């Protein structure tokens, strides 16, 4: 029933059915794992009703199937206190089944268990260190004498005896894979103890270890598991099962991991070909290596051939100059066509450059399905974080949901790196109590370590998504407090950038796509770049800063490719703020660039325009441009839909100047007699940068004075050591005199003529903009205006931008 609900829920498409298929079915023999009360390695307890449903009697031997194709045999006992559909098992059984508490396992009757003739059991080396005497007599004999215990080949079990417990592994059982050890069974325990390293195989990856790709996982399982496990399904319909899957996506999103997990969970033979490995200098050798790999896989069917980095061995044939590559591609094509369709061999390829693969490989019959393993969304990231932290010791305050919100654009590998970094952070804190020369580290120290939320936050500060490594941007440490004044502008920016990231549901509700771009213009030194930094910091989006001139290169077509690449990266790590500083360098009006490399600037601008229009509304990518020459920017960029908010950032007025002085001197010791208001009054027409310079200069004078005093003191002390004792320290601070001195050198960087230019530009904009300011709807009956809050709210979603923007401009122009 649940399945049906699930499938009808998810639009009833084939794929979502398959997600339903891959859900755990509700069946009587599927039980939820619970912690055992009596700690016995061979016993599981069930509720009497459950046993009745499964037609089991007390003391029956049952076969339990767990994850990663593991199963084991146990004895079933009834237990009234055990809840229904639960099964109680201890830690040893759980680890043999590779399950945790709360996982689902299936129970099957096992009538054909025989008494064993011989079993071969060996201890694990790290549990028998320092154990003297005969292990067989002390541990194994009493363990098997106290009950008839079923064992399964390959299982580990723990025997407590004397002072300690020893772990054993069942190496061989005779007659069958599982048997019951009776009193007359021979137990062999000769041989070297087993090494723990061989035991804990790390390549055991199951579906539980892959997170954030639920939809893709369903597709892959339907393409791989169904043909390998139930080929008759395809036969009965009369179609050929698919033969190839191409996984593509950014590096670190888990393509190879998925292939491993599929191979482990289906139990298929897994044959991994790493692209470059099959190359050889001898003619014909590389092709025969490929042929051998495919032959090997066909012998061991059902099998999966996984070609990692397939773009290295199957590039486009017309683009490659080497003969070998072409022959290898042709060989791969013929091999993939020649796989007999019933040979149960599936080829999986993985690449992060799907477009550099030969197109002949990407048709139906070779790689039939291409599955995009993309950057995970927030829920996906939470899954991945849970997987990576399931064995970590976390403190109570760790909020993984918060971490997954803050890691936009991270792929699985980045999240793994984040967890490692957080753990390292935890270890660093304990470094002062750890002595590296000691053989062993104190158990107390080890137990006291736990990764806390602060460690994660520090790690977040140090890491960034790998997609952005080369355009790496520090999210700047600039907050709104660092910016003096400009209240209107701040509010408008928050509406444009923060709302869509933090309240996307509101935009959906009003059916509006948020505006994508903002252009700051105004005289130099008024904080345009600073504003962009602050917005990047405040809204937790990724931030890519692009300096205009960097995009232009000497090669034809390269500059446009750079623009494309930057936008691709931004989309991959959305939500993202793209900040173009000095926009006028790449967005001048077209047609007047004479003599530069074949109009490179024009082509870059065209590329920019198409990219801005082609930005999918789904991805939250914002563009902020900053320029101090708005008059030469191509008008096509300034239309609504591209850079639709034009914000004039004027010279600061008196109040703003006071704020700027305050935020510049936040961290400096300023004497009580310095009146910042008077300074603000006096610095009419100064830009933010000029004011910062005044503060820096007065700081410099204060430092100079301080150092001179120190030198003077040293000299006096050298002359008369006694006299100096009672001299009290003077407080070092910036005094009014320093400001007065620095004001002598203060200068305005923006002339009145420049200001007039900006104001003229702003006014022309204002006129073209405020065209409908007289517009009112024809008088409606009074009733409707009362019943109009909804409409007012709708307007609120869109229109206040215009009004507040207009008002801001009015204020700013005449400030």
From Swiss-Prot:
**Role, per record:** Probably functions in cell division and growth processes. Interacts with certain SNAREs as part of specialized membrane fusion events where vesicles from the same organelle fuse (homotypic fusion).
Q: Which PROSITE patterns match?
A: AAA
Name assigned to this protein: Cell division control protein 48 homolog D
- Key word Transmembrane present: no
Classification lineage = Eukaryota, Viridiplantae, Streptophyta, Embryophyta, Tracheophyta
**A cellular component term, taken from the record's GO annotations:** cytosol
Record keyword Protein transport present: yes
Positions binding ATP in this chain are 249-256, 522-529
Record keywords, A-Z: Acetylation, ATP-binding, Cell cycle, Cell division, Cytoplasm, Cytoskeleton, Nucleotide-binding, Nucleus, Phosphoprotein, Protein transport, Repeat, Transport
- Chief location bin: nucleus
Q: Which organism is it from?
A: Arabidopsis thaliana (Mouse-ear cress)
